[in-house]
Each structure stands twice: as C-alpha cells, then as structure tokens.
Amino acid sequence: MDSPSPENPSGTNSPNPKSPQITGSRLSHRPAISQRPDLDSNTRSTPIPDDEHGADLPMTMSASVVLSSLPRDAHRALADAEAVDTGKVTVRFQPLPSAPILKNRVFKISASQKFETVVKFLRKKLDCKDTDSVFCYVNSVFAPGLDEGVGGLWRCFKTDDQLIVSYSMTPAFG
C-alpha cells in the first residue's frame, strides 16, 4: 500500500478536485484557481441583460407625503423654480481674440431651450460652414454641455441678468 506523502495526503495517485495541488511555482498562501467546466457554453458570449425599468412618473405635490407637508416657503420656491424655465432669458455673446464680432451681441431665448440651440444660433449668425468649429464658454470659465438648459445656466451663472457666452473659432481654454 502507498503511504501518504506531503504532496498527496490522501494516499492515492489520482488528483483530488476538491483539494488544490501545490506546485513549486505556486505559492502556498495563494488560493489555487479552480478549473471547472462551464455548464452552458453560450453564457460566455451573451451580454448581461439590461434591467427593464419603467420611467418614473412625475408625482404631484398632493400625492406626495413629503411634499404635502412642506412649509409655504418651500412651495413658493418650487413654483419659482418651475416658472424660471417658462420665460425668456437674455444672452450676450462676447467674442474672444481672433473670433469674428457680431453686429448685435444681445439676444433673447426661451429659458426652456437647450444650450445646443444657442450654439446653432451663433453658428448661423457667424455664417459658419459645417466643418467650422465654434467653442462657447459661459463667463469665460467653462464650456457647458449641449444638453444643459439655458434657464438653469442663466439662473446659476447670470451677470447683470444676462448669460454671458464667450465664443471662439479655436479652443481658448484648457
């Protein structure tokens, strides 16, 4: 009969799938990688399915437990926040060095529009080709995303009740 050896404590010469084999190249304090056959070979190529979540429906203030007990100031603030995006805001275009200058620099736009509309309007006023680039910056500080709301930008970054949009044909900042 074979006696158990330190490498094979079970005393048999067949490998035991439940106990990892320790080889000279593998450290004893690291776990062995188990080699188990996949039950379904199709699971490797199929992507993880997306969760099917329905869109959250907006909740009226009367249906909400939290919003129905807010103080009057909060109700007024919510109404003011909704009202800002219904009016018009003033946009002032400022050319950066080497940018063409507009004859009229001040325009009004609906607060509910996206910043993309401002960029398209500016491109039209500057007679840009499809291949020309226009870089726009709010207050000469940052370039907002095209999907940003003009009303939100105006509310947060207005100067003298105007949204200052600097523009250039080449990248001006960072």
Curated annotation (Swiss-Prot):
State the source organism's domain of life.
Answer: Eukaryota
Q: Which organism is it from?
A: Neosartorya fischeri (strain ATCC 1020 / DSM 3700 / CBS 544.65 / FGSC A1164 / JCM 1740 / NRRL 181 / WB 181) (Aspergillus fischerianus)
GO-annotated cellular components: Atg12-Atg5-Atg16 complex; autophagosome membrane; phagophore assembly site membrane
One GO BP annotation here? autophagy of mitochondrion
List locations, semicolon-separated.
Preautophagosomal structure membrane
Question: Which one of the record's GO molecular function terms can you name?
Answer: Atg8-family ligase activity
**Name recorded for this polypeptide:** Ubiquitin-like protein ATG12
Query: What does the record give as the function of this protein?
Result: Ubiquitin-like protein involved in cytoplasm to vacuole transport (Cvt), autophagy vesicles formation, mitophagy, and nucleophagy. Conjugation with atg5 through a ubiquitin-like conjugating system involving also atg7 as an E1-like activating enzyme and atg10 as an E2-like conjugating enzyme, is essential for its function. The atg12-atg5 conjugate functions as an E3-like enzyme which is required for lipidation of atg8 and atg8 association to the vesicle membranes.
Supply the source organism's classification.
Eukaryota, Fungi, Dikarya, Ascomycota, Pezizomycotina
Q: How does it sit in the membrane?
A: Peripheral membrane protein
The annotated subunit structure for this chain is: Forms a conjugate with atg5.
Sequence position, cross-link Glycyl lysine isopeptide (Gly-Lys) (interchain with K-163 in atg5): G174
The Swiss-Prot or TrEMBL record describes its family as follows:
Belongs to the ATG12 family.
- Tell me the keywords, alphabetical order: Autophagy, Isopeptide bond, Membrane, Protein transport, Transport, Ubl conjugation pathway
Q: Which InterPro entries match?
A: Atg12 (IPR007242), Ubiquitin-like_domsf (IPR029071)
The record's region (Disordered) falls at 1-57
List the biased-composition ranges (Polar residues).
Answer: 8-26
